[in-house]
């Protein structure tokens, strides 16, 4: 029986989401017939090496930023997902932006700022988004339509944690997301936040947000274009096995890329498993497919 080291938890602020992803993946891999060994980042190299392959759902710093991938590469262990270089690139939202801009892909106007420069930046004088240059799950992401003193106080606290953050033009439109499995785009999901709020951390995980597939407000030709852009972003940044790219469809039909996630959530309410389900992959089938990709890559490299 193939043994899978399943890494979940970590020390980032996304630990709880990671643990939830881990629980879902553990159940799925077990149902698919694998021996699953659940580990956290404090595991030893020996514990890792006792397994055939690694499946990490470590979200956030230390898990998605290339650090853990570097460790696995040094050990020579096959693992699901993007390599260290691609993980570093996509986790650094500023570097990711520069990569896409250089390739001519559509992305929102933005800049990396610190607390001293943020309030005076031209983009901050209009509706905008402030978010960490690294990180995910919408933690410390602020959507500012009309600046208020309470917003500034909260943002100042975030700058104390992150030092530098990404300031982006707020793009209005229909929010969508597209996953890539292997080299194939998955169906598009349209995200409709509750009328009372945005697609923030709370609404992302409390089940209040509507996630519709197929997207009722996005024409089929625009869905195809979004899938093409997601695949381009996936390939341009060197992603492997899986990724999920978030975008906005504007009223005039233009599609703007927001970001690409190399390690999308795998919880019961996560977007990637939902779009995979529509494509015909239940969780056991999806996780089995991902493990086989990692093992096949290792076999090819050893040949």
Positions of PLM-derived features:
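Phosphate-binding site of ATP-dependent enzymes
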Residues: 149-228, 249-256
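Active-site nucleotide/adenylate-binding loops and adjacent lid/helix of ATP-dependent enzymes
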Residues: 2-8, 36, 45-48, 89-174
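ATP-binding N-terminal substructure of ATP-dependent carboxylate-amine bond-forming enzymes
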Residues: 1-95, 114-120, 289, 293-301
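Conserved metal-phosphate-binding beta-hairpin within the catalytic cores
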Residues: 169, 234-266, 276
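Active-site "cap" helix and flanking loop/linker of ATP-utilizing ligase/carboxylase catalytic domains
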Residues: 191-243, 274-303
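Short beta-strand-to-turn element immediately C-terminal to the catalytic PLP-Schiff-base lysine
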Residues: 113, 141-147, 180-182, 250, ...
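Glycine-rich phosphate/pyrophosphate-binding beta-alpha loops
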Residues: 60, 137-138, 194, 261-275
């Amino acid at each position: 029986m193939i043994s899978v080291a399943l890494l979940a938890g970590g020390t980032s602020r996304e630990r709880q989401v990671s643990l939830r992803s881990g629980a879902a993946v553990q159940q799925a891999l077990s149902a698919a017939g694998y021996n699953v060994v659940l580990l956290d980042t404090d595991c030893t190299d020996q514990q890792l090496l006792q397994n055939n392959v690694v499946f990490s759902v470590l979200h956030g710093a230390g898990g998605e930023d290339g650090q853990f991938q570097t460790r696995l590469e040094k050990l020579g262990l096959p693992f699901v997902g993007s390599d260290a270089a691609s993980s570093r690139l996509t986790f650094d939202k500023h570097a990711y932006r520069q990569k896409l801009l250089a390739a001519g892909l559509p992305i929102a106007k933005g800049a990396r700022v610190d607390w001293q420069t943020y309030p005076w930046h031209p983009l901050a004088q209009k509706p905008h988004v402030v978010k960490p240059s690294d990180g995910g799950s919408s933690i410390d992401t602020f959507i500012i339509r009309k600046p208020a003193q309470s917003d500034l106080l909260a943002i100042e606290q975030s700058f104390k944690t992150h030092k530098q953050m990404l300031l982006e033009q707020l793009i209005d439109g229909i929010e969508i997301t597209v996953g890539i499995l292997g080299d194939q785009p998955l169906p598009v999901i349209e995200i409709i936040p509750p009328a009372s709020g945005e697609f923030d951390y709370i609404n992302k995980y409390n089940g209040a947000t509507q996630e519709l597939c197929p997207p009722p407000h996005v024409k089929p030709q625009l869905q195809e274009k979004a899938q093409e852009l997601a695949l381009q972003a996936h390939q341009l940044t060197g992603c492997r096995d899986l990724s999920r790219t978030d975008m906005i469809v504007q009223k005039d039909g233009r599609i703007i890329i927001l970001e690409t996630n190399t390690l999308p959530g795998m919880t019961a309410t996560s977007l990637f498993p939902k779009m995979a389900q529509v494509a015909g992959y239940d969780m056991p089938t999806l996780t089995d497919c991902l493990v086989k990709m990692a093992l096949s890559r290792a076999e090819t490299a050893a040949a």
